[in-house]
Amino acid sequence: MLYFLIFFIFQINVNTSNKNLLSFNQQDKYIDNNKTIYKLVLIRHGQSSFNEENIFTGWTDVELTKTGIEEANIAGEILKNNSYKFDICFTSTLKRSIKTSFIILDKLNQLYIPLIKDFHLNERHYGAIQGLNKKETSLKYGKNLVYKWRRSYSIPPPKLNENDIRNPANNEQYKNINKTELPLTESLEDTVKRVIPYFEKEIIPEMKKGKNILVCAHGNSIRGLIKYFDKLSDEEIVHVDIPNAIPLIYEFNENFETIKSYYLGDIDKINAKIKFIKNLEKQIDNFL
């Protein structure tokens, strides 16, 4: 557990599954498993208004705050200063993520590239507690139960009623999506099961074509990808916190195994932001 925490605070590579430097492929040719073949950039959207107000956001389509806009601009500047260019940007259907993508691509003078918006990259849906203040929710349902909904891997909040305005099926935004694919609530496990098949079907093929990919998404959808890339257990992933608007770089070998991952930018500022988000989550847990 200490090793795990060190990675997420100091960005030390986590790749315990890849123990051999070299291996054979099907053509009996040596593959260097530590050679970077593919690179992927992940980024969580900038701060949103509900982040600031301590509200369960989920699929609620809220705006970026002034801080969130500034964070996105800084992220774009960091990527620009490190000479990053992209061929495709994948994002969710939620405007806090879309606008973060726009700001970053504008900084890179790359607003012309394809921006693919898909609900599979959306934040976790918080069901009946979505849009509610976290403290008020704790008073209504009890601290222990709300903590389980927030921090367990497989326990979802109560479902929405189908006629609830918060049901995505009742939202113009999702009118072309099969209703059976739209959630009434989700656990983190449900979110992972939504994100990973999409990544494998839509994003990996583009990476294999040599495309440089930016994924701008949300805390829990990015958690799902981290769990998949780093082969984290259900218990480990619930303790991973994703800071807003810091580029997270993943490097993979030919077999799409993680070689290393790291946040991009000034190390002191990165560590301060990671510490801030971890302390904020602890404060919320204690506040409930």
Labelled PLM ranges:
Residues 1-18:
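Classical Sec-dependent N-terminal signal peptides that target proteins to the secretory pathway
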Residues 23, 27-31, 35, 75-168, ...:
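Phosphate-coordination/substrate-recognition cap region in phosphate-metabolizing enzymes
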Residues 39-43, 116, 211-221, 225, ...:
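Beta-strand elements within well-structured catalytic alpha/beta cores of enzymes
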Residues 58-74:
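Short catalytic helix/loop segments, enriched in acidic residues and glycine
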Residues 190-206, 211-219:
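GST-like fold's C-terminal all-alpha helical module
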